[in-house]
A protein has these predicted regions:
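Signature of N-terminal electron-transfer/Fe-S-associated modules in redox systems
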Residues: 1-194
């Protein structure tokens, strides 16, 4: 079945199986790796993307259902090496560790902040209930969301990808943190069940 949609600002037209999930379309057809497959049962949120600006779990959406719509992945938030304010906040507040859940958390946060630009800590926790992280304990993730909201409220621009040594960490460590927020980390993790 032919499907036309916009992915990260680029118009696409592809032949797909009618039952192909959006997460698999993004990864296998588009080559975008940020949306991760963690459960395939809508439980973990690692596959979260924006569909017409609303965060959705892409393992629950058939690609044909997204026809004619706009899909944004974590890669689409960071054009030209600049981090989106949410991605920058996740890096700055250490709201990531292994990075598997991070792109989904980032996209859920972008969706949350578009609906509620000034959330309380309780509203952040409630808004991210559908996204699991096995590493961080959520404290730094919540701090990152609140920092992103404050940055957006102040009208601050996105930041460039990190330079080496500015905060005492190595350039490799800082770049890895930025890469995890954009879903482009070099050491891609294996998919659960793959």
């Amino acid at each position: 079945m032919q499907v036309e949609l916009t992915v990260n600002g680029q118009q696409r037209s592809d032949e797909v199986e009618p039952r192909l999930l959006l997460v698999h379309y993004l990864r296998e057809v588009c080559g975008l790796r940020a949306a991760n497959v963690g459960c395939d049962t809508t439980s973990c949120g690692a596959c979260t993307v924006l569909l017409n600006g609303t965060s959705v779990k892409s393992c629950t959406v058939l690609t044909v259902q997204a026809a004619g719509q706009q899909v944004t992945t974590a890669e689409g938030l960071a054009p030209d090496g600049e981090l989106h304010p949410v991605q920058a906040a996740f890096r700055q507040e250490h709201g990531l560790q292994c990075g598997f859940c991070t792109p989904g958390m980032v996209m859920a946060t972008v969706g949350l902040l578009s609906e509620n630009p000034h959330p309380t800590e309780a509203e952040v926790r409630e808004g991210l209930e559908g996204n699991f992280c096995r590493c961080t304990g959520y404290h730094n993730i919540v701090r990152a969301v609140l920092a992103a909201a404050a940055t957006a409220a102040a009208g601050a621009p996105a930041t460039e990808a990190p330079a080496a040594g500015a905060d005492g960490t190595s350039g490799a460590d800082r770049t890895a943190g930025a890469d995890r927020t954009t879903g482009t980390a070099a050491g891609e993790r294996a998919e659960v069940g793959a």
